[in-house]
Amino acid sequence: MSEPRTGHYLMGKLGVYEVGQFLGQGAFGKVAKCSKLGSNECFAIKIVDDMEAGVDEAKAMGLIKSLDPDANNLLKFYESFKHQDYMCLVYEMLDQSLESFMRKNSFRPTHLCGIRAIAQQLLVALNALKSIQVFHGDIKLDNIMMVNQDSTPYKIKLIDFGLAMDSWDMELGTTFQIVPFRAPEVSLGLPLGVSADMWAIGLVLASLYFGRLPFTYDEEYDTLRCVVQWLGLPEEKLLNRGLFSTDFFTCDEDYSQPGWRMNSPSEYSKITGEAVRRLHNIPGLEDMKNIHKNIFELFDHDDHQTTEKVEEEGLHGPEAAPDQTGKRNQATSTSRKNSCKKNNNYNRNPSPQSRRLQTSSNQSGRGRRSFSVC
């Protein structure tokens, strides 16, 4: 069957749509701006070429539709239908993604008032999803849209629920999220929850604050090296439980101070067979903060402290939650005693080869997920 093109018509349940300009392309399909015949309405229609993935997303949106999308800053979903071999999902038309907004502004740091507004809206969205036990799984700059930056500045909505899953269905060791936004618990193979979405939100806010992605690397090891430099080693109890901890860390039991340490680049390459880039002059967290302060000197010290606190809470710990942003998980291990104790229920590291196969099939953070609707 031929792929839908500009000028083609799509027969939905709620009307007939004429395909206009294509706005973007993802792992499973394209998004087109479409006009509804007989009206002046425009919609964003996601045309998915993987039928199973399209059906999964439609099921997820059916559940999310029970929430008030405007009050909870979630993309409004209208209908889904099949067109030949494609699944079509009809969404409201929005303005631009945060990534496009940053690009248009030459990646200059965003004012704190804008960051604060975006943070509040994202936490409302995440809390709404948590209330129905849904995990987004792909929060990044491209998946946060501004509604209309000219008429309603910094009003945003969370979009793209193609990877959304029921929190009860998340399997231990599942790999998702693109690497620059991937939470440490995903890389380490720890039990998953809303904290992974919280981590991604922290990185979105940090990107707006700094005018650049904090972690720009495509390999998990490189990203984790930066995380450790900024926040210190993960807690020993987390490293003890991680399915993939020994890909990235080694537990030294024979030294005078036994405990976990990060593998050197050569050790990591030997374990996984993956090359590691040489990282030079990784900016520290304080250096990155000063970039923003030097640009916006008119904002007072309290504004910066408040924003930095929210960002840091988003970047800490599996216990972080959207309705408990004041509760921080301690990222740095405080004791190295008995740090190499293993929990046999969790420390089942598969071979590096099997992990690489899982990760390589998911480089874009995309993967087919089951989504049960009760």
Give residue spans per PLM region.
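Activation segment signature within eukaryotic-like protein kinase domains
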Residues: I118-A119
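Activation segment/activation loop of eukaryotic-type protein kinase catalytic domains
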Residues: D142-V179
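C-terminal lobe substrate-recognition/regulatory segment of protein kinase catalytic domains
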Residues: E235-G317
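Conserved end of the kinase activation segment
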Residues: E185-A196
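A conserved loop-to-beta-strand element in the N-lobe of protein kinase catalytic cores
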Residues: H83-E92, E99-S100
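Protein kinase glycine-rich loop
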Residues: V19-A27, V31
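Conserved HxN/HPN-centered segment at the entrance to the catalytic loop
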Residues: D68-E79
